Amino acid sequence: QVNPGTPRGGGNVKGEDIKKISENKNIYSYVKRINSVADLIDHDIVETKETLANQSPERSKNFKRTVMLTGVNESSKENKFVSGAYKLIEGKHLENQDKNKVLMHKDLAKKNNLKVGDKIKVKSNLFDADNEKGADETVEVEIKGLFDGHNSGGVSAAQELYENTLITDVHSAAKVYGNTEDTAVYQDATFFVKGDKNLDSVIKDLGKLDINWREYNLIKSSSNYPALQQS
């Protein structure tokens, strides 16, 4: 494998490559996703009996207020919202032009007495393996909406709980790692192909772009759009 991914085994797709594909005439829309880690400032995460039982003293110290960020340019097209695992119950979805906005789980909001329109601060976590630059950034974000949804299986760490995931705009998720939207490392991207186009010929066409295709796979999805993932 020529693309080993991030230190934590996450995706490693370049923003500039996503841009090249998105500019193809047969693509009408796309979703790009960044996974990052940050700490809530002055707010607490959701814990369960399971997550507390599994916690080492070191983990409870280093990741006491740590949440997962899913940075996405259009949240209504994000996998978990499409599949129904997450459901927006209040406010509005994140859109392409949004900056410093988040969707928060209703249980996390309830625990911290937060509502749509409130602002919170998140900051880089220096113990996170994927924070390769040792970034120490603080980002203030506004809650644009609340979502619901619960893990189907058990979890060992609080960060795996849906309750402790913030859906953010791409800019905010990139910034906690000291990146911009252009320099960020993306988990994956999904491209929506115009309905009258033959998918195989579009994929063949994209293969001619100036992109190192040894690093990626274009996955053909049954719902008629290719997804870009690390190979």
Residue ranges and their predicted role:
Residues Q1, Y225-S231:
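Hydrophobic alpha-helical transmembrane segments of multi-pass inner-membrane transport and secretion
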Residues V2-S223:
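Basic-flanked hydrophobic alpha-helices used for secretion and membrane insertion
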